Amino acid sequence: MKAVLILSGGMDSTTLLYDLIDQGYEVSAITFDYHQKHKKEIACAQKTCAKLSIPHKIVNLSVLNDLAPSSLTRADRDVPEGHYAEESMKQTVVPNRNMVFLSLAASYAIGIGAGHLFYAAHAGDHAIYPDCRPVFVSAMSTAFHLCDWNDLVLQVPYLMLSKGDIAKKGIGLGVDYANTWSCYKGKERSCGKCGACTERLEAFREAGAADPLEYEP
């Protein structure tokens, strides 16, 4: 079965890549460079795909920095610190980002004859990111049935899982989490304070494992 995966280089999508390979999918990965501060995730995605011999496209979407400003992309906006579920984390929303990503990934999937499109939204995303909610996934799934004569199935298997659940699954699959990136601040080492870092650290604690990344003191 041919499938396309939106691969950021973070924990969730990297785990899903290993998961799909384990299930026997013939996976092609697509990564989007939208001028995010945390570009290290792109390098992680490249390294993972090279290691696993996965076809990998990187698409330049730096225009989102102009059209859809966010603290994830703008130098004049600080990435908020605190828990992932805090209201301040809404500053990290890139307006309509996943709809743009999914639309382009759908074109790629249809173009290469893949019948399945995957992305790794999970339960912890629902409160902050509108384009990770079940209702959004349902609407996009309907759109993909209508957008082309070739039927494309949108699959979001981690939609109701916590990040801790995903970490446990990934550890069982042998995911190399040292080659993933979560921190939104884009520094040499993870900050340990932004929402992405706090959720990642919680996930490893829940999974009973140590995070292999180094954090700022």
UniProtKB/Swiss-Prot annotation:
One matching Pfam family: QueC
Q: Which reaction does it catalyse?
A: 7-carboxy-7-deazaguanine + NH4(+) + ATP = 7-cyano-7-deazaguanine + ADP + phosphate + H2O + H(+)
Q: Which residues form a coiled coil?
A: none
GO MF term set: ATP binding; ligase activity, forming carbon-nitrogen bonds; zinc ion binding
InterPro entries per the UniProt record, alphabetical: QueC (IPR018317), Rossmann-like_a/b/a_fold (IPR014729)
The record lists ATP as bound by L7, S8, G9, G10, M11, D12, S13, T14, T15, L16, L17
- Report the EC number(s), separated by commas if there are several: 6.3.4.20
Q: Which positions, given as ranges, span the membrane?
A: none
User: How many cofactor units bind, and how?
Assistant: Binds 1 zinc ion per subunit.
Presence of the UniProt keyword Nucleotide-binding in the record: yes
Which EC class, in a word? Answer: ligase
Name the domain of life this protein comes from.
Archaea
The biological pathway it contributes to is:
Purine metabolism; 7-cyano-7-deazaguanine biosynthesis
Q: Which cofactor does it need?
A: Zn(2+)
Which amino acid positions bind Zn(2+), per UniProt?
C183, C191, C194, C197
Protein family (similarity comment): Belongs to the QueC family.
What this chain does, per the entry, is described as: Catalyzes the ATP-dependent conversion of 7-carboxy-7-deazaguanine (CDG) to 7-cyano-7-deazaguanine (preQ(0)).
How is this protein named in the record?
A: 7-cyano-7-deazaguanine synthase
Q: Which organism is it from?
A: Methanoregula boonei (strain DSM 21154 / JCM 14090 / 6A8)
